[in-house]
């Protein structure tokens, strides 16, 4: 029998299912296909990583007690700003600074994440990325 505390008793989503986190559409400067100067890309990475960390902490993800080891599923839904659907590989690369910022907020190494990207057919003004984390048992 597991000694883990039930989700409801902990007052947090004990990694079974966490609340979703909504982030803005990633900058085109983060695309692996972008031909931008390295300083511009570096600035975009730093800004995106910091923003994701702040938003994850505001969402209450910074205080979660996570298992010490094991993998965590990272469900990423991309809602593009236009009808043009980007490929999921490019979007995952553009999402990497967000992933690092979320890992920073959780206090874990981002190697623990198993990414599940999905480019949605729905359009959202300005585009957005919705992230959920679930535990793998």
UniProtKB/Swiss-Prot annotation:
According to its UniProt record, which protein family does this protein belong to?
Belongs to the RusA family.
GO molecular-function terms, A-Z: endonuclease activity; magnesium ion binding
Disulphide bridges, residue numbers: none
Entry keywords, A to Z: Endonuclease, Hydrolase, Nuclease
Q: What is this protein called?
A: Uncharacterized protein XF_1666
Keyword Nuclease in the entry? The reply is yes
Q: Name one GO biological process term.
A: DNA repair
């Amino acid at each position: 029998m597991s000694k883990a505390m039930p989700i409801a008793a902990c007052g947090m989503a004990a990694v079974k299912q966490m609340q979703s986190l909504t982030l803005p559409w990633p900058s085109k400067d983060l695309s692996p296909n972008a031909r931008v100067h390295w300083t511009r890309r570096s600035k975009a990475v730093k800004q995106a990583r910091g923003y994701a960390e702040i938003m994850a902490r505001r969402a209450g993800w910074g205080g979660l007690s996570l298992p010490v080891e094991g993998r965590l599923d990272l469900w990423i839904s991309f809602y593009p700003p236009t009808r043009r659907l980007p490929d999921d590989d490019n979007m995952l690369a553009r999402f990497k600074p967000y992933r690092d910022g979320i890992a920073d907020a959780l206090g874990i190494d981002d190697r623990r994440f198993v990414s599940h990207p999905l480019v949605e057919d729905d359009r959202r003004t300005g585009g957005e990325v919705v992230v959920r984390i679930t535990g793998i048992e």
